[in-house]
């Protein structure tokens, strides 16, 4: 079994793979102050309550956009699984040509998503990841990572409205039935959700123009992907586990090197 970690600014998503099959997944809050012992305990409990044995884990791979948390997670991996985790970053085999001005500037999460999407759906394609930030990534027909756009996440936008406007409440993010609303809460929900749908549709439309492909697939992932996809025809597929699948694919591309490295050590 392979354990994968997708570490975002808000949540850490963990997945357990047996071959290509995702057999279990969990989500916990990203906590920079949590110690390696605390993370190890939480992971051990997940395995225990789901009838999985930590001793069956053959290897670990981590993708993170939060550098401050890496020491705790790497140390937790050493304690639980007696091995150094594979970290997605410089020097790792991705199998993807990154056409960015400085490839090191591309977030690991964006590359992981692009690899999974191209492997599963082919190209050209656009990936929209609804996370703390919403990222738009373009992949060519030949599987090249072309770049993309980054905008504030829908929750960040919602919280900013609540924090900066004294009389406006914090609202639940749901898909409103109409745009012309008759109370403050519904009006905010309509403005946030439909405004965000408009943002997505406009960016996707312009990316398709630049790609010179009106037929390229648009894949959505992330916690709020279903909410936004339900209100627009711009999104073709919602793939909740795209990042986890990408990590498993990257691990497989680096498996032989890992085995050789472990034998030498």
Curated annotation (Swiss-Prot):
The keyword Cell inner membrane does not apply. Belongs to the type III pantothenate kinase family. Its EC number is 2.7.1.33. This is Type III pantothenate kinase. Its main location: cytoplasm. Catalyzes the phosphorylation of pantothenate (Pan), the first step in CoA biosynthesis. One of its GO terms (cellular component) is cytoplasm. The gene is coaX.
